[in-house]
Structure formats: C-alpha cells, structure tokens
Amino acid sequence: MNYQNDDLRIKEINELLPPVALLEKFPATENAANTVAHARKAIHQILKGDDDRLLVVIGPCSIHDPAAVKEYAARLLTLREALKGELEIVMRVYFEKPRTTVGWKGLINDPHMDNSFRINDGLRIARKLLLDINDSGLPAAGEFLDMITPQYVADLMSWGAIGARTTESQVHRELASGLSCPVGFKNGTDGTIKVAIDAINAAGAPHCFLSVTKWGHSAIVNTSGNGDCHIILRGGKEPNYSAKHVAEVKIGLAKAGLPAQVMIDFSHANSSKQFKKQMEVGADVCQQIAGGERAIMGVMIESHLVEGNQSLESGEPLTYGKSVTDACIGWEDTETILRQLAEAVKTRRG
C-alpha cells in the first residue's frame, strides 16, 4: 500500500515573484540610495558615540493605506529637516505584523485586507512606497520577520528591528548578521534583557544559513556579521524605561562586552498598551537625556495622523490616517514629543 505523506495540510501553493522582478521594476533612484546610505552612516556614528544626536524611529504601528502614509511622510520630512541638528529621524514603515495569535499580518501578507493574501501585490505596493519615501529624502525603518522578504525591500531600509517574539530565534539572529543596515533587538515579551544581549552578540558573528537569491533560487548564505546592533527596551511584565532600568541594562551590556547603547520604545509594554502614555514615557526619557544620560542613543514611537486605532472587523468605513493595529499618538502630540526630545538633546550637550 502506498502512503501519501507530504503536503497533507497544504491547500494551495502559488508562485512568488522573484525579487529581481521588483528590483528591476522599481529600482532605487539616486536620491533614494543617497538617503539610505547617509542615514545608515549617521546611525552607525550614533551607535559608535561619534554623533551625539538621538536616533528617533517614529511612525505608524503598521502600514495599510499608502496615501495616508505619504502624507505622514511629507509632514515628518519637514520636522526631520527642522530638528536635524539634534535628532536623526527615521520613519517607521512596518509592512509585516507578528501576531500573538491570529489577525491581519500586514500589507505585504494581505494588502487588500480581505483575506485574499495577494502577497505579490503586497510586495509591489511595499517596494514602491518605500522607494517614494526614500526618494523624498526621508529614511525608512522596518521589522524583519522572515528570510525572504528582505530580498525585496532591504536595500531601502536604513534601520531594522527584530521584535520581542523573534529576538530569541536563531534564524532571525542569522538574518540580522547579514543585513546591511543597523538592527535593534527588542527585549523578550516577559521583559528579560538577556535574550536581546545574546542576540546582539550572535548577530555580530558570521553565520551560514538558507535563504533565496535575488533570482528566487534557494541558496546558502554566508555573512560577515553585523557590528551595528543594539538593544531596544520595550517593557515586559512591567515598564523598563526608567533611569533605574537603563542603569541595569548598562551593567548587563558591559558584562557582555557590549557598549552602553540603549533605545527606548515608548509604546508596547512601556506604555501599558495605552497610547497616550507614550507622552508620559517620553517626558521621563527626556528628563534622563537632559540630565546627561548618554547611553540612551535612540527612541521608538508609534504615531500617525489621527490618534488611537480602529478595528478591521467592525465593517465600518476606515478613518483616514488612523492605525488598524496598535493605537498611536496623533500628529499634534508627534510634533510636541519630537521638539521635546530635541530640546533634551540640546540640554545634554550643555
């Protein structure tokens, strides 16, 4: 008797466009490439302590409406220019969302938000949007969730994140070791920092792993290691943005032979999932920076045109410029917190 033992739970397999198809359709312009190169260099210098500005990764929790995102980007670019003496502002452009259980996984996975999962469409939309944002002079940041998607968009990312759910994953540490941009590792969902510290050391080393080429062929990838990695404090069972927590992290980093470079996420467990509390976290962090704390090299903020969030499940028409995932602060608060951070940096300089 013959047994069928393979693909028993696979309903359908569809061909994915090879990365080269989108790289040729939407090649990086000279402006876009220049934006990425300069932002990566600036972040590298901040991480090495050669630039005393603050890295600010700010933007929507997730991207679902390119039109609203372009408007947000245009506004943010104006602020980036105004505050460039104190802040290196990079827009958070997250196309993929890790879920605790189930839910909408982001624009690349389900661009039409109707469970049609037109991933080829999602990749096209994502690359074109990233290209437009970078071409305008605004650098972009994203979260990396798998080993394939970076081949479509990583050349347009100035900074990358590995999330709390994936920081402990060997695959993601290997991926980070080969990314061309600086990478931040979040502490674990329970608040432990050791997994992030271990991840930084692991990503700094060379690795050999499986991925795909730009032509979509399965490949063996050898990396040289990424020396531009750092920790992101996002809270856990309790917030971990206070001066006491920062001091503890500095000790942990020193024991691991790593520089005291810390990014603080104003959202997630640090704000107890209450978006308005990002302003309270920001006030505390500004106080630490103004007080001379140089280990805080960056912050992350969830912000959109309209504050709060909305449900995809309600069946109601979506509000323009409002998050469909985590709640964000609105534009007015965005301007306020960025100017406060810039003033804190000025004070830190003395």
Where are these regions (language model features)?
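A contiguous, surface-oriented mixed alpha/beta subdomain in the mid-to-C-terminal portion of proteins
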Residues: 233-236, 240, 248-263
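Active-site-facing alpha/beta catalytic cores
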Residues: 2-6, 73, 86-241, 245-246, ...
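Internal helix-turn-beta structural module
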Residues: 304-347
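N- or domain-start disorder-to-order transition segments that initiate the globular core
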Residues: 9-48
